Amino acid sequence: MFGSLVKKVFGSKNEREIKKLWPIVARINELEASISPLSDEQLRDKTAEFKERHGKGESLDALMPEAFAVCREASKRVLGMRHFDVQLIGGMVLHSGKISEMKTGEGKTLVATLPAYLNAISGKGVHVVTVNDYLARRDSEWMGRLYSFLGLTVGVIVHGVEDDQRRINYAADITYGTNNEFGFDYLRDNMKFSLDDYVQRGFNFAIVDEVDSILIDEARTPLIISGPTEDSTDKYYVIDRIIPLLKKGEVKEEEANTLSGKRKLYTGDFTIDEKAKSATLTEQGVLKVEKLLKVDNLYDPRNIEFLHHTQQALRAHAMYRRDVDYVVKDGEVMIVDEFTGRLMPGRRWSDGLHQAIEAKEGVTIENENQTLATITFQNYFRMYKKLGGMTGTADTEAEEFHKIYKLDVVVIPTNRPLLRPDFPDVIYKTEREKFGAVIQDIKEHYATGQPCLVGTISIEKSEVLSELLKREGIPHNVLNAKQHEREAEIVSQAGRLKAITIATNMAGRGTDILLGGNADALASQWRRANPEAGEEEYQAILKNYKTVCAAEHDEVVRLGGLHIIGTERHESRRIDNQLRGRSGRQGDPGSSRFYLSLEDDLLRIFGSERVSKIMDFLKIEEGEAITHAMINKSIENAQKKVEAHNFDIRKHLIEYDDVMNKQREVIYTQRREILGGQDIRESFLEMLDETVEEIVASYAIEKSPAEEWDWQAINEAVFKCFNLQFELPQDTMARLTPAGLKEMLAEQAHALFAARVKEMGDDLIDHLIKVMMLQAIDTHWKDHLLNIDHLKEGIGLRGYGQKDPKQEYKKEAYELFMGLIMRIREEVVERIFWVQLERPEEVEEIEEEQRSKKIVFNLSEEEERVQEPARSNRVAGRNDPCPCGSGKKYKKCCGK
């Protein structure tokens, strides 16, 4: 009550943020009178003036009102669009390094031009990040006209662009591109053998479009560049053949007291946990698998791989469904993005799961790959000095944006009031009844001519609905991952009279649905179908389409605008809001309603018990629906529970990945220094001295007399590392200390190295050191990534030993990293002292061989794959430590 009173008197935090910006809007509007009369050339000269003033110390904040006024005027002249006042506010929020939440149709693409232009004045580059190649190309071409008019350069980074062109595009003042391409370029750069081959420059300012999709939905998806291993794929077929012989079981009553409480007993050979998407063999199942695979003990270290692949095969058969989680296209298993419904070609599930699904579907199994380089979007985007974001739906995730990225969300007022009523959910007992009601609703709207956009959560459901509509004789378009090529075309016409569009979550983010249809898109479609037609004929067709669309627009507005029908609630409220947001853009009328059933995944897994009790209490008959605020609240609570669970997983992921991130920064910085040739000789001599220290520390014990040291081991280590037969005069043995031994060894090793330099020459030895250092770093870093993966997979089990998994992970990851540094050092020192060159060109040949390997991995064998968070396959008891690695009890964490 007190909180609402304070809000009434002082306004919400969001309102106060917006209020502070209105005076700057007024200042920009005042400047319009002096900017408008300028000629095109004078307007362009303003950019050079701003650069000069900034170079002399004037801040970008001070330049902002003038720069925004210039950008707005240029937009009027070039694009025919003048930024609204609320769009100016959106631009200021982005410039200040925050997230602008702007409703669909409020012109986010145009808003981004303001902070992009202002920040490009510094000359340090601006990256505008989009979710796909189509939007990156479209926006760079569309808005690029504005930037070019103002004297700025524009680049675009999409799949298939060669390195030389990428370098030019990154050097531009403003660079558009996809999140994947930006991330992969960072990884690829740090695998190169010359700084001249790098394509990226510094991380100055990024504006992330659809920021919720990239920084929340994709946060658990690391970018991975990997190369093939030589493991056989036969094992996947062998294991796949035994899966149909295993019977799914259920949990029996908890029986048999144990030290940790009651133990769950199971029927059948395996059980599944839909919440965790995991499958577990029962004791009976383990015995059966051992018999089928003809192995004695599945838990024997030599057979543990069989156990792992059996569990992955169980998941493939029991948890992953064709046309829901993936599709089979052209003999390949392609993942379907659960958030957008789009196909993700090239992406693969890790840890043998993808191969298990390939075996299940009977397609060719591709080898598992070994990670060569990896980074999460969370850590990639945190490298930018300043980060801003835009989306229509961020407020529900405001806490996560603030906690993980230090990004505040500011909700920007709409230019025109939102006129869309969102009707209460309608809930049925069964999916059959629900679909019957959806079809009836579509028929009623189709009869009047009002367009409908019907949202489904999977390809499978969209095709079921399509089949039902075909039976009713209702023409419609289906937009799912199978028809993604026609996405923009279908979405742009979804607002026409009598248009019925069924869409998975992808629903064409980035393409506006115009009521009455999009005349330009229709004319472009006609032009593609009639390439021989002349410009005059095209203009006549365009004029005709504009007349038709204008008439349809007025009729659709009269009918109530675009009607949204949701056929299922998503786990995230944000995705539901995105579907609703397709309607009611820029003051257009519209409406939305969700139809649900107790058989829907969200209600079945997370909340149906309470809802079912309410329906039983109200004696709901078959075919009868219910709309009740209490049920809506239960559904929202189920969604909040899932959102909180997913947030916890992402938070734990970043805490673990931060450890890896620091190690990656050290390795990549060292690599760049080597490529820059900075003090490379001094770096090698430091390695040499550290190797001497390591040998002495290992075998020369401070408190023991020198006679008792392990001299055989010392001599072997010295010979192995330095190719040196170390001889110690007998008369020095009695008074020798570890410090004295270190000094003698270092002196002899330095002398030997000096002889090598004299023999090979300064340039050749420096080149050799550089090549050997890079080779050692790349080889051992790859192995280190594999070791870290293995560590991460098993670390959750430490909780059972009353240890904090996170602390154990940090400690062991540090030990692994120190081991990595030591192995790199030893290998470089050994190679420099042992390598025999018959001719100087051999160093370049070694370097070229290494470089060509990287090119293979980068271009033909590179693979971007989805790596799911590691989970323990054991089902945790309520008082057990949570397998997610938080260190809390399961009942207090993911088991809530």
Swiss-Prot record:
<dbReference type="GO" id="GO:0046872">
    <property type="term" value="F:metal ion binding"/>
</dbReference>
<dbReference type="Pfam" id="PF07517">
    <property type="entry name" value="SecA_DEAD"/>
</dbReference>
<dbReference type="InterPro" id="IPR000185">
    <property type="entry name" value="SecA"/>
</dbReference>
<feature type="binding site">
    <location>
        <position position="512"/>
    </location>
    <ligand>
        <name>ATP</name>
    </ligand>
</feature>
<feature type="binding site">
    <location>
        <begin position="105"/>
        <end position="109"/>
    </location>
    <ligand>
        <name>ATP</name>
    </ligand>
</feature>
<feature type="binding site">
    <location>
        <position position="893"/>
    </location>
    <ligand>
        <name>Zn(2+)</name>
    </ligand>
</feature>
<feature type="binding site">
    <location>
        <position position="882"/>
    </location>
    <ligand>
        <name>Zn(2+)</name>
    </ligand>
</feature>
<dbReference type="InterPro" id="IPR020937">
    <property type="entry name" value="SecA_CS"/>
</dbReference>
<keyword id="KW-1003">Cell membrane</keyword>
<keyword id="KW-0479">Metal-binding</keyword>
<protein>
    <recommendedName>
        <fullName>Protein translocase subunit SecA</fullName>
        <ecNumber>7.4.2.8</ecNumber>
    </recommendedName>
</protein>
<dbReference type="Pfam" id="PF07516">
    <property type="entry name" value="SecA_SW"/>
</dbReference>
<dbReference type="InterPro" id="IPR014001">
    <property type="entry name" value="Helicase_ATP-bd"/>
</dbReference>
<dbReference type="GO" id="GO:0005886">
    <property type="term" value="C:plasma membrane"/>
</dbReference>
<feature type="binding site">
    <location>
        <position position="87"/>
    </location>
    <ligand>
        <name>ATP</name>
    </ligand>
</feature>
<feature type="region of interest" description="Disordered">
    <location>
        <begin position="867"/>
        <end position="889"/>
    </location>
</feature>
<keyword id="KW-0653">Protein transport</keyword>
<dbReference type="InterPro" id="IPR036266">
    <property type="entry name" value="SecA_Wing/Scaffold_sf"/>
</dbReference>
<feature type="binding site">
    <location>
        <position position="884"/>
    </location>
    <ligand>
        <name>Zn(2+)</name>
    </ligand>
</feature>
<dbReference type="InterPro" id="IPR044722">
    <property type="entry name" value="SecA_SF2_C"/>
</dbReference>
<keyword id="KW-0472">Membrane</keyword>
<dbReference type="InterPro" id="IPR011115">
    <property type="entry name" value="SecA_DEAD"/>
</dbReference>
<dbReference type="GO" id="GO:0005829">
    <property type="term" value="C:cytosol"/>
</dbReference>
<dbReference type="Pfam" id="PF02810">
    <property type="entry name" value="SEC-C"/>
</dbReference>
<dbReference type="Pfam" id="PF21090">
    <property type="entry name" value="P-loop_SecA"/>
</dbReference>
<dbReference type="Pfam" id="PF01043">
    <property type="entry name" value="SecA_PP_bind"/>
</dbReference>
<dbReference type="GO" id="GO:0008564">
    <property type="term" value="F:protein-exporting ATPase activity"/>
</dbReference>
<dbReference type="InterPro" id="IPR011116">
    <property type="entry name" value="SecA_Wing/Scaffold"/>
</dbReference>
<dbReference type="GO" id="GO:0017038">
    <property type="term" value="P:protein import"/>
</dbReference>
<dbReference type="InterPro" id="IPR011130">
    <property type="entry name" value="SecA_preprotein_X-link_dom"/>
</dbReference>
<keyword id="KW-0963">Cytoplasm</keyword>
<dbReference type="GO" id="GO:0043952">
    <property type="term" value="P:protein transport by the Sec complex"/>
</dbReference>
<comment type="subunit">
    <text>Monomer and homodimer. Part of the essential Sec protein translocation apparatus which comprises SecA, SecYEG and auxiliary proteins SecDF-YajC and YidC.</text>
</comment>
<dbReference type="InterPro" id="IPR014018">
    <property type="entry name" value="SecA_motor_DEAD"/>
</dbReference>
<dbReference type="InterPro" id="IPR001650">
    <property type="entry name" value="Helicase_C-like"/>
</dbReference>
<dbReference type="GO" id="GO:0065002">
    <property type="term" value="P:intracellular protein transmembrane transport"/>
</dbReference>
<dbReference type="InterPro" id="IPR027417">
    <property type="entry name" value="P-loop_NTPase"/>
</dbReference>
<keyword id="KW-0811">Translocation</keyword>
<comment type="function">
    <text>Part of the Sec protein translocase complex. Interacts with the SecYEG preprotein conducting channel. Has a central role in coupling the hydrolysis of ATP to the transfer of proteins into and across the cell membrane, serving as an ATP-driven molecular motor driving the stepwise translocation of polypeptide chains across the membrane.</text>
</comment>
<dbReference type="GO" id="GO:0006605">
    <property type="term" value="P:protein targeting"/>
</dbReference>
<dbReference type="InterPro" id="IPR004027">
    <property type="entry name" value="SEC_C_motif"/>
</dbReference>
<dbReference type="GO" id="GO:0031522">
    <property type="term" value="C:cell envelope Sec protein transport complex"/>
</dbReference>
